[in-house]
């Protein structure tokens, strides 16, 4: 890949790519004695994404804070855990304090030092993104962030990727999406963006199409791959 064709903007997904939604299992165990924190955290995340899909397909947009709250109610009920209103509010607030993956901050620092424009592109509502980046410490290594909220649709709808490019005032060819989510990779690819899939689980790619993409196991590896492209 030549310097004239190499994407100069790296747009990072937030949840699961830079910060770990499943790491809140330990806090769930502490706050809900007798509950299975990891099971709740996993189902919570699964339903959060599912509800965002439903809302987009049905054209009944509610923001990601709402999807997060609704998903927690279901996950707790499915795991036979009863939540008081106070517990529900406290648990929902955990999404404002998600832990970054260990490789996130070092990779962002190195990529920014190498001259890349770094942004977060997330389903999160503006307050969720801002709080998460501030509390995780990752915000200082980013140039900006973009929420899907203004277009009232969630990933992987085509409109959200067009919104990303327009908000950045960039050419499609200059933007590469970095995400651990196969649906996000599918959506970005369909919209004409370059992609890099972060395969943290080590499993197969669960995409709708067989298409070329950069696959890495960590953000450290992504940094190394991009360094090699620059040679």
Residue ranges and their predicted role:
Residues 2-9, 109, 121, 125-126, ...:
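Asp-based, Mg2+/Mn2+-dependent phosphohydrolase catalytic module
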Residues 38, 52-89:
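A metal-dependent, Asp-based hydrolase signature
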Residues 27, 43, 70-74, 90, ...:
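Alpha-helical elements of Rossmann-like donor-binding domains used by nucleotide-donor carbohydrate transfer enzymes
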Residues 25-28, 44-48, 68, 91-95, ...:
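Hydrophobic alpha-helical core bundles mediating ligand binding, dimerization, or RNAP-core interactions
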Residues 65-66, 83-120, 130, 158:
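Short, acidic loop-to-helix structural element flanking the phosphoryl-transfer center
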Residues 2-46:
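Active-site neighborhood of HAD-like aspartate-dependent phosphohydrolases
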Residues 24, 40, 87, 138-141:
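Hydrophobic side chains within well-formed alpha-helices
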Residues 32-37, 78-83, 113, 137-141, ...:
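Short helix-capping segments at alpha-helix termini
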């Amino acid at each position: 890949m030549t310097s004239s064709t190499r994407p100069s903007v790296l747009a990072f997904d937030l949840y699961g790519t830079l910060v770990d939604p499943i790491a809140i299992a330990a806090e769930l165990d502490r706050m809900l004695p007798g509950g299975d924190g990891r099971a709740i955290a996993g189902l919570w995340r699964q339903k959060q994404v599912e509800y965002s899909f439903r809302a987009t397909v049905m054209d009944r947009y509610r923001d990601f804070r709402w999807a997060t709250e609704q998903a927690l109610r279901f996950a707790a009920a499915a795991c036979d855990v009863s939540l008081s209103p106070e517990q529900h509010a406290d648990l929902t607030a955990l999404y404002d304090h998600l832990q970054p993956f260990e490789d996130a901050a070092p990779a962002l620092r190195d990529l920014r030092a190498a001259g890349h424009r770094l942004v977060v592109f997330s389903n999160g509502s503006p307050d969720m993104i801002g709080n998460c980046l501030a509390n995780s410490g990752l915000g200082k290594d980013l140039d900006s962030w973009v929420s899907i909220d203004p277009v009232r649709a969630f990933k992987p709808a085509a409109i959200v990727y067009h919104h990303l490019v327009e908000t950045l005032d960039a050419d499609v060819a200059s933007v590469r999406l970095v995400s651990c989510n196969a649906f996000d990779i599918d959506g970005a690819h369909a919209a004409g963006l370059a992609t890099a899939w972060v395969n943290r689980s080590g499993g197969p790619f669960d995409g709708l199409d067989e298409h070329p993409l950069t696959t890495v196991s960590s953000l450290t590896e992504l940094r190394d791959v991009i360094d090699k492209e620059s040679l």
